[in-house]
Structures are given as C-alpha cells and as structure tokens.
Amino acid sequence: MEKYHGLEKIGEGTYGVVYKAQNSDGESFALKKIRLEKEDEGIPSTAIREISILKELRHSNIVKLYDVIHAKKRLILVFEHLDQDLKKLIDVCDGGLESVTAKSFLLQLLNGIAYCHEHRVLHRDLKPQNLLINREGELKIADFGLARAFGIPARRYTHEVVTLWYRAPDILMGSKKYSTPIDIWSVGCIFAEMVNGRPLFPGASETDQLMRIFKILGTPNSQNWPDVFKLPKYDPNFPVYNPLPWETFIKGLDDTGIDLLSKMLKLDPNQRITAKQAIEHPYFKETN
C-alpha cells in the first residue's frame, strides 16, 4: 500500500469501498478495498470471482485490473481510474445524450459485452453506474462482482441479479436458467436511458417493474413468448396490455436505432439479439 497515496473515497461497489489514489509517478488508480471481516472466513467469494474473471478478460472496453494486494484483514484491488460513470453523465445532460455520443457509448458497451460473452462470462449487473468513462470518450465496463462464468446449456442460477430497473422480465418471473440475453436486456435499458435522459422502467418493486415493462412492451402471451407459462412467477391473470408504438416513449432515435432497441428489448429471451449481431446492425453503419 506504500505505493499509493492521496486516498479519496469515490464510491462503493458490490462489496467494497472505492478510493482514488496516486502512485509515486502521479498516475491515478482506483483502489477497491474489501474488508475481510473474520480471518477464518477468508476472501469473499464475490471478490475471488471478480479477480479471477478480470485477470482473464483483456479488452479496451473492460476496466483493467493492475494489481491485487492482500493486506492485513483486507484485500485491495488496483484498477485503472476513469473520470466518471455513465449515470453521472446522463444526469448532467438534460434530455439525454447527443445521438453521436449515445451511439459511440452503445457500440463500446456492445464490444465489451460481446467479448465477455465469447469468453463465457455473464456480467449480470449492467447499469449506467457500472460503466466508466474517461475524458477521451472511452467507455469501460466495471464491477464484475456478480459476474459468473456460464456453461452451455444455461445452468440454474440465482435470479437475484441485476439492479431492478435493468432486470429482464424472465428474471423477474423467476427464471433461474438464463444466459447472455439477460445482459442484452440491460444494454437495451441503458440505450433507452442514454437517449431519453431517464430510466425506461424505474420500478419500485419486482411486481411494479414487470407491470412497467408490460404497459410499454405489452403483456407476454403464447404468440410473443411461447415458454412464458413455464416460469415460476408467471401469472395467467396478469393485466393485459397492448404494446405502445416505440416513438411514444423513445424520443430522438431514428428508425434503425428503434429497430435495434426493439431487438434488445424482446420479452422472450430467445428472441433477443446477441451482442455480436447488434454490433453488425445498420444503426452503426455510419459510425467510424
């Protein structure tokens, strides 16, 4: 720890406090300190998971893990430092980001997620607060505390993942067999938030979250989601809503952008576009 000085608290992650610090050369780093409550408990499984995943992932749109320091009663992860997160940027840009900026961030996010998915890693907690941005306009995915290597076919996982507003309807209805489409749903929610300047589905509870999704995208049925009836929390008495036209709730997005968003926010996870397919979508054809 002697290598770093000038600690300044900048946030809290899934399981630890994050500080900004500098080394002797004046370079800035983000230090994530994980307190080890009891010596006999050892390192939290979430921390071990994040370390093992991040050590394997090397991509320009994924935050770099430089060092791991095992100090007395605490573990310190040394990450590259970025100036701010996407949530803060959206908050200061009244009415949403400029279309060229939103497009650039979305493409970078998809590139990072496609890389994760190719390496059999689900992030499981994508939200604007976990997307870091530097002054050059580079976006990097952070906070892999909930990430988990996935097998084929999809295994049964806990459904208590992803902050409520970015949680897919299949998870909300109790699906424990899920895969890459849960990250794509979150990406779609983030895309809409960048464009609109506010969250698309800001639910107050799991039930409220589902109802907000259904009121906009329509209630699932055997036509648009054949397997929905198999989910533990599916209710045949859900109120029936018809889908709204996209332009009524998404402002300032052209037809190709709406087409891409609609493919990310499919109710049925099996119908959602993959990250790799999304990168090839016509929406990005004008992007350098």
UniProtKB/Swiss-Prot annotation:
UniProt modified residues of type Phosphothreonine: 14, 158
Regulation: Phosphorylation at Thr-14 or Tyr-15 inactivates the enzyme, while phosphorylation at Thr-158 activates it.
SMART domains (alphabetical): S_TKc (SM00220)
Entry superkingdom: Eukaryota
Null mutant phenotype: Normal asexual development in host erythrocytes, normal ookinete and oocyte development in the mosquito vector, normal number of oocyte and salivary gland sporozoites. Normal transmission into the mouse host.
CDD domains reported in the protein's UniProt record: STKc_CDK_like (cd07829)
UniProt xrefs under InterPro entries: CDK, Kinase-like_dom_sf, Prot_kinase_dom, Protein_kinase_ATP_BS, Ser/Thr_kinase_AS
Binding-site positions, ATP: 10-18, 32
Similarity remark: Belongs to the protein kinase superfamily. CMGC Ser/Thr protein kinase family. CDC2/CDKX subfamily.
The protein's name in its UniProt record: Cyclin-dependent kinase 2 homolog
Organism of origin: Plasmodium berghei (strain Anka)
GN (gene name): CRK2
